[in-house]
Amino acid sequence: MPKSVIITCAPTGGIHTPSMSPHLPITPAEIATASIEAAQAGASIIHLHARHPETGKPDPRPELFQQFLPVIKQSTDVVMNVSTGGGLGMSMDERLLAATSTSPEMASLNMGSMNFGIFPMLQKYTEFQHDWEQPFLEMTEDFIFPNTFKTIRYAIEKLGGDHGTKFEFECYDLGHLYNVKWFVDQGLIKPPFFIQMVFGILGGVGADSDHLTHMHNTADKLFGAENYEWSVLAAGRHQMPFATQSALRGGNLRVGLEDSLFIGKGELAQSNAEQVTRIRSIVENLGLTVATPAEARMRLALKGGDQVGF
């Protein structure tokens, strides 16, 4: 019998800017509402960033996370996954601050340094509400997103060791899987672990179904299919097709306005819940079931919602 599909929703992220969609959650209240609605629609994990409530700029301050994490916890049983990616240009200490302050069940962790180019968005968006938006996009033409072996080890030991937090290991290219393997071999990553395969970011692996097949096959060879859970996210218009392919292949998936602002060609998603509802319908029409938060916790061996710091 096929495993149920774990749906992660990433409601705001740190890539899109407020001028790109009026539906992008910005304030703590908006992020809380978007997360609760996504959980009610079928997401079992919520991947969370924070933003400055007035400007919408990615903001790592723990006090912002503390304004929405408890609200989400009070309203749902969803697993909360705090980003350590933060916003482009943040130091590793800044990126870890929210997670080390809140001790979540899960945190994301990028598994390799890379070019992270979102500057092509400037070809589409030319008018901005806030002064920071255009320079933020422009700087990524000459920017390397740093995730060294030393900083990855630090994050694993700090969050995993000190807090019992487990990771969503974000792999933007084939080599990132081998980086995960190195840490597995060192005994720093233990099964069951969670691999998020990311497609369609300029600087990472392209959104081609052949690459999805190769990434999945390589992960099986490196880790053994019984030792890990895998999930797929794809940027922009590739979001739903790649999520569907992952479900068909026995994997899990991620949607949300962090990864795509749209629900269809040229049509902005009105909410994160709209995307979750769409992919849940697809999954169920394929004869598959959607995982509950309890099922996600069991399969990922999480510490439980009663062990967090919020």
Regions found by a protein language model. Name each.
Residues P11-A32, T84-S91, E141-P146, E168, ...:
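Active-site mouth loops of central-metabolism enzymes
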Residues I31, A38, H49, A107, ...:
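Conserved, mostly hydrophobic/aromatic
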Residues M106-E258:
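Catalytic alpha/beta core domains of metabolic enzymes, predominantly
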Residues S19, S44-Q66, V198-G203, L261-K265:
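Glycine-rich, proline-tolerant flexible connector loops at the mouths of alpha/beta enzymes
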Residues Y178, N217-K221, P241-F310:
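Structured C-terminal cap/extension of enzyme domains
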Residues C9, T33, A43-T55, V79-N81:
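Histidine-centered catalytic micro-motifs
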Residues M1-H23, K124-W132, E138:
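N-terminal small/glycine-rich loop or linker at the start of catalytic domains
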Residues C9, K57-V82, A155-L159, M215-A225, ...:
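Alpha-helix-loop-beta-strand connector modules within alpha/beta enzyme cores
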